[in-house]
Amino acid sequence: ADYPMRRFDKTLDVNFRAPFQVLQNSIPLLRRGVEENPDGGAKVIALASMAGVYSEAGLAVYGATKAAMLSLVETLNAEESGNGISGTSIAPGYVDTDMSDWTKDKIPADTMIRVGDIVELAASVLRLSSRAVVPRLVVTRAGAGLGA
C-alpha cells in the first residue's frame, strides 16, 4: 500500500502511541482506584475500530493501529485483571461522525451506528464488577455483515 511515512507516523502517534502512554501513566492511578473500590475495580475503555478486526482496502495503517489497541487492552487484562484492573476495547463499524463523511456516498448516515450507542456500551461496561472482564465489543451496523 502506498502510504506516506509522515502520515504513517501521525496515524501511529494518534491511534496507538498516545493511548499507550496514557495507559502506562495511568496504571498507578488505576491501582489506587482498585484499593478504594475493590468490588468495582478500575476500568479502561479504549476505542478501537472494526478495521482492527476485519481488513478493509485502503485502511491498512489505520486498521493496524486499531488492531494494536485491541492487543494492548487484551494484554492489560492478562497482566492486571487479577488485580482488579480491566480493559474493554469497543470496535465499531461505521459510526455517524465527521470521520465517516468520506463513506456517506456509499453508506447513508441514517444507517450508521449512533455515537450514543457507543457511549451506552461504555457506560454498561463501567457498571460491571471487577469480577467481569469484557476484552472487546465488536459492533456492526444493522443489516450489515461483520466488517461493515
Which residues fall in each region the model found?
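Substrate-binding pocket helix/loop in short-chain dehydrogenase/reductase
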Residues: 1-9
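Active-site helix of classical SDR
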Residues: 23, 65
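A short helix-coil junction within the Rossmann-fold of NAD(P)-dependent oxidoreductases
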Residues: 25-40
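Residue(s) in the substrate-gating loop at a strand-loop-helix junction
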Residues: 49
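Active-site-adjacent segment of SDR/Rossmann-fold oxidoreductases
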Residues: 54, 75-85
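Active-site loop immediately N-terminal to the catalytic Tyr-X3-Lys motif
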Residues: 54-60
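C-terminal helical subdomain
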Residues: 82, 89-90, 97, 105-148
